[in-house]
Amino acid sequence: MSLSPKQEQLFKQASKHIPGGVNSPVRAFNGVGGTPVFIEKAKGAYLWDVDGKRYVDYVGSWGPMILGHAHPDIIKAVQTAAEDGLSFGAPTVHETTLADIICEIMPSIELVRMTNSGTEATMTAIRLARGYTGRDKIVKFEGCYHGHSDSLLVKAGSGLLTKGEGEPTSKGVPADFAKHTLTLPYNDIPALKECFAKFGHEIAGVIIEPVAGNMNMVKPIDGFLQAIRDVCDEYKSVFIIDEVMTGFRVALGGAQSVYNVKPDLTTLGKIIGAGLPVGAFGGKREIMECIAPLGGVYQAGTLSGNPLAMRAGIEMFKHLRQPDFYNKLSVQLEKLLAGLQAAADEAGIPFKTQQAGAMFGLYFTDQEDITSFDSMLACDIEAFKKFFHGMLKRGVNLAPSAFEAGFISSAHSDEDIEFTIQAAKETFAEMK
């Protein structure tokens, strides 16, 4: 399935020298079928493909475009920074300014280190937890994604609660790496307590997406995040909240502010650079002082804290800190989700939505609640594929996977919301 012969030809050309024709697997449309859409430009709430077709965009470069694409203030900040030089490999005042902003907004972060991506941030946070505690095991949760580092590409495996070992989810990850990672069911407090009862004194840390945006969008049940905090305190393990996706999207203070839980370490992603390649990790001073050059845990990067990303992020936070910014986003998203739900109900299609700030999930199911990876797997993935292509055909861009969250930006207007709801009505009618 392809939108046009031109798109088909471009994908064929890309596949000649790029593995699978893409530089990140989800872009290949394997989750929905068909040929990827090649984008030429973006502005505000819209994307335009190489055929000139416009789409209302709910991917937002996978989250960071909270102000919409090509916001004039961000573009100006990047252009000004570029005129002064692209990268110095040396400190700038802009790194300090952005670090100050992040620490002020997220009080759990006393010291912060910039990286080049969310994967780098989570990878180093794991290394730091191990270095700080002198332990090897890490706990993660099924359905959560923390980047593509070896320690985190791991599933539960049959030996989890007998030998305390996980299994790789990717070829090339040594079994010796995976055995140190324990994968538990999301939102399962008894499993968490059982795991710590058996292996607690071997566990360096726990890492979790506070709102899981990689099994569509699953929120924590009451008490789940606090239960993690409690067992980490009891066993002196490091509690890592991965806010690469939720940070400054769910709320200004991140999901940790919404759920009133204080992690030891937090990881952040490209939103802190307004969408440019950047990440960060930070947290308690005592732990962060274990990072080189202060301590023995090594981390480095030539482009870490690069001036383009720093200055773009500083400019973005001026907008995010405006009164009522997040409330307006949330209200706009509520309109969208209510309209989509009404359209599905009218068509008699089992459908459910969930919202966390400016993030949302769409599920084809009659389940009352989606609280785990297993409940996500029980949704109708084939129905999502049909919905995705129906919406794409009508000019609405959703994530090309039933397992990815959606995002709204401050650029989405009432007209964009109505356009999307109308497209959904037509698509649902087609699916009946």
Curated annotation (Swiss-Prot):
Organism: Acinetobacter baumannii (strain SDF)
Entries under NCBIfam families matching the protein: hemL (TIGR00713), PRK00062.1 (NF000818)
Cofactor: pyridoxal 5'-phosphate
Domain of life: Bacteria
Subunit structure: Homodimer.
Catalytic activity: (S)-4-amino-5-oxopentanoate = 5-aminolevulinate
EC class (word): isomerase
GO CC entries: cytoplasm
Annotated localization: Cytoplasm
Record-level Gene Ontology MF annotations: glutamate-1-semialdehyde 2,1-aminomutase activity; pyridoxal phosphate binding; transaminase activity
Name of this chain's protein: Glutamate-1-semialdehyde 2,1-aminomutase
CDD domains: OAT_like (cd00610)
Pfam families: Aminotran_3
Keywords annotated in UniProt: Cytoplasm, Isomerase, Porphyrin biosynthesis, Pyridoxal phosphate
Known EC number: 5.4.3.8
This protein's pathway: Porphyrin-containing compound metabolism; protoporphyrin-IX biosynthesis; 5-aminolevulinate from L-glutamyl-tRNA(Glu): step 2/2
Residues bearing the modification N6-(pyridoxal phosphate)lysine: K270
GO biological process: protoporphyrinogen IX biosynthetic process
Family listed: Belongs to the class-III pyridoxal-phosphate-dependent aminotransferase family. HemL subfamily.
